[in-house]
Amino acid sequence: MPRRREVEKRKILPDPKFQDRIVAKFVNNLMRKGKKSTGERIIYGAFDQVEAKLKDDPLKVFKKALDNVKPVVEVKSRRVGGATYQVPVEVRQDRRTALAMRWLIEYSRGRGEKTMVEKLAGEIMDAASNRGNAVKKREDTHKMAEANKAFAHYRW
């Protein structure tokens, strides 16, 4: 246990367009080299494409996509007597959201469309309908945890 006091979480201001903290956090994750305006342009462009294609509120679709990508359990390595076990542990709420955002961005960047706006829009729409690589990543994570359920008693 650390002897110093717990570090406060930084308050993230809501984004200018949707007044939503989750979108602002996503923009911060998407941003590279401090270029926030570029990150905002990408995500707002992706939201416009989602709205045009699905004729639905893009914020609602985005939140549904995030919920579909959030992992419930993950595995952590734990060394016990010379052997390393993959121990399944439950994921905290804030880490779930962070992982979901990270995976959405990672698998968006790996898609085949031409611009990042199109890639992100495609991955958001796929994730909202339980398809796509980000959802597959969550399923793989859950499978790993399920396969290593026997080591759950090593949790710390």
Curated annotation (Swiss-Prot):
GO molecular function annotations of the record: rRNA binding; structural constituent of ribosome; tRNA binding
- Show the Gene3D superfamilies listed in the entry: Ribosomal protein S7 domain
> Which BP terms in the Gene Ontology apply to this protein?
translation
- Name the GO cellular-component terms: small ribosomal subunit
Listed A to Z, the keywords are: Ribonucleoprotein, Ribosomal protein, RNA-binding, rRNA-binding, tRNA-binding
Tell me its family. Belongs to the universal ribosomal protein uS7 family.
* UniProt xrefs under NCBIfam families: rpsG_bact
Q: What does this protein do?
A: One of the primary rRNA binding proteins, it binds directly to 16S rRNA where it nucleates assembly of the head domain of the 30S subunit. Is located at the subunit interface close to the decoding center, probably blocks exit of the E-site tRNA.
Describe the subunit structure.
Part of the 30S ribosomal subunit. Contacts proteins S9 and S11.
State what protein this is by name.
Answer: Small ribosomal subunit protein uS7
Q: Which organism is it from?
A: Anaeromyxobacter sp. (strain K)
Per UniProt, what is the name of the gene that codes for the protein in this document?
rpsG
